Swiss-Prot record:
The protein, known as: Ribonuclease T
Exonuclease domain: residues covered: 20-194
Similarity comment text for this entry: Belongs to the RNase T family.
Species lineage: Bacteria, Pseudomonadati, Pseudomonadota, Gammaproteobacteria, Enterobacterales
Record gene name: rnt
Native organism: Buchnera aphidicola subsp. Acyrthosiphon pisum (strain APS) (Acyrthosiphon pisum symbiotic bacterium)
Cofactor binding remark: Binds two Mg(2+) per subunit. The active form of the enzyme binds two Mg(2+) ions in its active site. The first Mg(2+) forms only one salt bridge with the protein.
Cofactor(s) recorded in Swiss-Prot or TrEMBL: Mg(2+)
Domain of life: Bacteria
Length: 221
């Protein structure tokens, strides 16, 4: 395999990490006490030329876990009725098991070492995901325990915007505010944004890294 072909592998792009775009809608801000209401993930792949694309999607409405807190301000914001039977909600455990099975399979296929959360304001989603995994007592957690790719931070660097809708528009993507705060829609837009950020860096010549050239300018600053 040539050097360029090696650089075009997903496993070599992010230090063997398998990026999984995720958005979680919740009934509050406390990952340990407040209910997860909706979760969506999108896995990613790289084509033969090293361009990043969306791959598969999972989306679940979640039943509030026993004893969880439902904050009225949170559900007024995301407009989710946790107890509406038409949501077709499933248990948190079944949803998390399905997600982790998908991630483990992707890690294996892509030759990666572990999953890494990609999210907008990623600390929030990562905290809720880790709390849910612990709550349902799954020991083999494929995700990195603290590292994430935060598209809010990356967008602030690249286009000077940190709000998801503004970042998407600044980078040339459409955004429908009426669909915002749906886990499925926000995950889709975050995935589009992350792919464009990564691919734009490649188009500008930032990837693959020229280590020799970078070492020669290492004392510039």
């Amino acid at each position: 395999m040539s050097t360029n072909q090696e650089f075009n592998l997903l496993s070599n792009r992010f230090r063997t990490f398998y990026p999984v775009v995720i958005d979680i809608e919740t009934a509050g801000f406390n990952a340990n006490t407040d209910a997860v209401l909706e979760i969506a993930i999108i896995t990613l792949k790289m084509d033969e030329l090293g361009w990043l694309h969306k791959e598969d999607t999972l989306h679940f409405h979640i039943e509030p876990f026993k004893g969880s807190i439902i904050n009225s301000d949170a559900i007024a914001f995301n407009k989710i009725d946790p107890f509406n039977p038409l949501r077709g909600a499933i248990s948190e455990k079944i949803a998390i098991q399905s997600i982790l099975k998908k991630v483990r399979n992707g890690i294996k296929i892509q030759g990666c070492s572990r999953g890494i959360v990609v999210a907008h304001n990623a600390n929030f989603d990562h905290n809720f995901l880790m709390a849910a995994i612990q709550r349902v007592k799954i020991k083999n957690n494929p995700f990195h325990p603290f590292a994430t790719f935060d598209t809010a931070a990356l967008s602030g660097l690249v286009v000077g915007q940190t709000v998801l809708s503004k970042a998407c528009k600044a980078i040339g993507l459409s955004f429908d505010n009426h669909q915002a705060h749906s886990a499925l829609y926000d995950t889709l837009q975050t995935a589009n944004l992350f792919c464009e950020l990564v691919n734009r860096w490649k188009r500008l010549g930032g990837w693959p890294v020229d280590i020799k050239k970078n070492n020669s300018t290492s004392n510039k600053y």
